[in-house]
């Protein structure tokens, strides 16, 4: 019989948590934010990080945090239950439209072409926000430093037939995505794509691709970070249904249209099986 003092400790028991000083909220103008940070970072391996993500944490490089704001609960951690996800008509069209993209999964690594696309994306989508001036070192610290099981995925067009004399010439780079592989799912870290291609919905395609990958790996969830009703930048996440949100430590199906963000009956959220037209 195991003595109570010999019971296995929680994976989080060796960590310490502290709250940051207040800082301007990057999502809601005029708001003040705080974060709760998990330390020390060298103890946060893939198993520990899986538990932290289940508790609503995210990471930026080796910095692991979750919202810890005074009097505000606008940030809702969300995830897609893979086997219950049903793509809508628009998502099926996006999947078919970009089905020819070639996805290559690799360890995190620096590539000058990736960095150039990142800077174009930031300049077009987030001009004046600071990230459009990121140096190569800042880019690496943000996206290429990880102590857990992380991958870089690049999406390219098929090689141009005009380069028949150069069989190793890759197709045009359209998108790069960083993902973490957890014990119970994939976690979408960050994605940037070609901003000069209008109305492409690359971001939507990326999430659909991650859902398919999770399904093939028999992982039940795709974690999408935080959803904020008042933030237009976050609106796309509500299109992936059913969507689960973390409420008081429990994951429940979320109704984005509910005035009080009340969870809904899970039996009403979506149907089983992923039905994406591959044609």
From Swiss-Prot:
Key words, A-Z: Acyltransferase, Cytoplasm, Transferase
EC number per UniProt: 2.3.2.29
Pfam families to which the protein is assigned, alphabetical: ATE_C (PF04377), ATE_N (PF04376)
A Gene Ontology cellular-component term: cytoplasm
GO terms for biological process, alphabetical: ubiquitin-dependent protein catabolic process via the N-end rule pathway
Compartments in which it is found: Cytoplasm
Catalysed reaction equations from the record: N-terminal L-glutamyl-[protein] + L-leucyl-tRNA(Leu) = N-terminal L-leucyl-L-glutamyl-[protein] + tRNA(Leu) + H(+); N-terminal L-aspartyl-[protein] + L-leucyl-tRNA(Leu) = N-terminal L-leucyl-L-aspartyl-[protein] + tRNA(Leu) + H(+)
PANTHER family to which the protein is assigned, alphabetical: ARGININE-TRNA-PROTEIN TRANSFERASE 1, ARGINYL-TRNA--PROTEIN TRANSFERASE 1
Name of the protein in its database record: Aspartate/glutamate leucyltransferase
Organism: Paraburkholderia phymatum (strain DSM 17167 / CIP 108236 / LMG 21445 / STM815)
Taxonomic lineage from the root: Bacteria, Pseudomonadati, Pseudomonadota, Betaproteobacteria, Burkholderiales
